[in-house]
Amino acid sequence: LMAEGAARACDSGADIVDINMGCPAKKVCRKAAGSALLSDPTLVIKILRAVVKASESPVTLKMRTGPNQVHKNGVTIAKIAESEGISAIAIHGRTRNCRYDVPAEYETIAAIKDSIGIPVLVNGDIRCGSSAFKALSKTNADGLMIGRAAQGNPWIFSSIRAALDGERWNEPSPIERLEVLHSLLESLYQLYGKEQGSRVARKHIIWFLSYLPIKSEINKATMNKIKTSHDQLNFVQFRKREFENKG
């Protein structure tokens, strides 16, 4: 099935095919998917071999450092990936069992980087320029992958790029953040339809609001009341006018 999906993705114009062996969610791991696959190197070989063979585009892999703290087999999985034709690997600095409950560690990623020749991207606890410097310096990785820290904050990429390049970067104003949120909501409604789109939009509104000088308890309480796409857009516009009036 994964090989078939890869072929379809390539036919649709995908630049890369990315295999996710990093997700620690229970509902995913219960189906022997995501980071649960790290416990079965033989199955990993079969999957990677099939997907690489079926894909006309480069195939990349996203993974964790291993199933648990005792069994960190990240180096083994990374070597398998390289031998099976994977073009690059993004590694999250936690095991499957750690989920997001402990700080990311970069020593295992550094060991993986030293053991293979394909590009390695470091992932985990990268939230700003200083944490990006730390992750890169500790791992000697070829690049960064940012996940949760981008929720509600798409500017994180330009801010980290500026920090790494030693350039000045200007924080977006609350008004600019709300304008981008408004545009995002309209795109969600167009993609999913207004009913489903409004449900998907709720978490994005909360994420964006977390970067504004508004009390979080007000955000959550308010979100329980604004359920329709019309109400959500009006709410964002109302918040925008508040900041405009403050000057």
Label every model-predicted segment.
Residues 46, 54, 70-88, 100, ...:
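Alpha/beta catalytic cores of nucleotide-metabolism and tRNA/nucleoside-modifying enzymes
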Residues 26-43, 94-106, 167-168:
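Glycine-rich tight-turn/loop motif centered on a GG-T
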Residues 35-37, 44-54, 61-63, 69:
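Conserved beta-alpha-beta core of the PfkB/ribokinase-like small-molecule kinase fold
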Residues 1-14, 36-43:
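Glycine-rich anion/phosphate-binding loops
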Residues 22-24, 64-68, 94-96, 125-127, ...:
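Active-site beta-loop-alpha junctions enriched in small/polar residues
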Residues 1, 58, 63-76:
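Active-site glycine- and acidic-residue-rich loops that bind
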Residues 13-24:
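Short, flexible active-site-proximal loops enriched in glycine and acidic residues
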Residues 18-20, 60, 90, 145:
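Conserved beta-strand positions in the central sheet of alpha/beta enzyme cores
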